[in-house]
Amino acid sequence: MRLKLIPKNEQELSKLFVLIFPLTLLLASLTSFLKDAYFTFANLIPNNKIFNYGFLDTLHYQATYGVLFATCICLSFTYLFSKSLGRIAILFPILFLTLLGLVGTEFLDLVLSFFYQDRINVVGNSSLLIILKLLVGFGLFSLASLNLLAKREASIFVSAQFIYGAIVFYFISLLISRSELVVFTDSLMIKSLHTSMYIYVCVSFVFLSIVHFLMTKPLGATLFNKTLTAITFWGFLFLLPWTNFKYYFGSVIPNWLENVSIYLSLSLLVPLLAFAVNYVKTIQTKEDEGNKSSSLMSFSVIIFLITNLLHIISSFENILPIVGLTNFQNVINQGYIGSLIFASISFVYYLIPKVFGRLVKYSRLEDLVFSGLKFMYPVLLINNFLIGVNSGYSWNAGANAGSPTIYGEGFSLSLIHI
């Protein structure tokens, strides 16, 4: 296996991110294990600047939604974007440095969190690091726009459309979090909007770009309907950025904004149905059964559909007060990032023979790993779901009795804003 220090094209660059992806996935899994292990054995472990749940939770967030997600963007952009445009990437050396900078700044953010815990921000630990992220984000947005304008195909494949949308919202999410806000309400609103744009939109769009490729090219299938794809793209584009405000129901966020968030969340059913129908009809035209990793792609779609259904159902009037400001928010976040992770694993298994020129020999180990992932991740989501609903009931029961209970309201506020 040869890995050039300075790649000359997208295929050589894809090798780099195919190798980086398992490492970042392992890093995210390790931080998740440390966080949950500390929560379980907190009474046996000393409490200091490193071993405390707030810091470990932030560390896990930066490893998962920072480093791992940046790697997924780079992996999908490197292989899918230019192929969808029908040409090689222009200004490739600058693009190579920009993609490395994207992963590098996120990893630097992770490292600096050990030294500047009192300056942790939503998107960075210091003003200089946030500026670096903005520069990298602007560079990636500019290069993607230039390549889009220089396309050779009359109509681009939908993967490029979703990737470009993810890059645009990634850059916007950095811009809106740049301001230092003193008023708590403003800070809470910006944090909520950042979550919607960064996790809901960006993660979903990278996932959709990978799935639309995996359900067509590797399986020899034909995309069922481009109109349904357009409904999926524009529906999620306009609706998802405003759907996180509802989870702060009853807090300091204005009531009109909460109501708008509720109505738009219910409207997610339209693009979700468009995607589900398009996926099912497209899969029915497949000519190849694919390899064993294709099952992870199908499983990722199931996780994505369930996550959005929970996101929609939580908007009902009798349910929202129970799930708002509880651990239920983690179910939505983990559902979106989990669907992307499973799709990316399947994508990496597809790329290995393409970029390295060697077949993947599946063994019982792969069967065991795939089965373990399919079993454990739903258990994780169900666990967070039950914790969130239980704490919501406890909070409402205590509030109605005149004695507010722990955990319910205030979740996700103290660790981030105080």
Residue ranges and their predicted role:
Residues 2-16, 34-57, 72-95, 111-122, ...:
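Juxtamembrane membrane-water interface segments of multi-pass membrane proteins
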Residues 21-31, 100-106, 136-139, 160-178, ...:
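Alpha-helical transmembrane segments of multi-pass integral membrane proteins
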Residues 27, 33, 55-59, 63:
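An N-terminus-focused feature that recognizes amino-terminal "leader" regions
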Residues 60-75, 200, 334-348, 375:
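Core segments of alpha-helical transmembrane spans in multipass integral membrane proteins
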Residues 65, 196-204, 262-268:
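Structural signature of hydrophobic alpha-helical transmembrane segments
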Residues 166-170, 199, 210, 214:
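Catalytic cores of extracellular degradative/oxidative enzymes
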Residues 196, 280, 375:
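Divalent metal-coordination and catalytic microenvironments
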Residues 416-418:
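Conserved small/polar residues in nucleotide/adenosyl-binding loops
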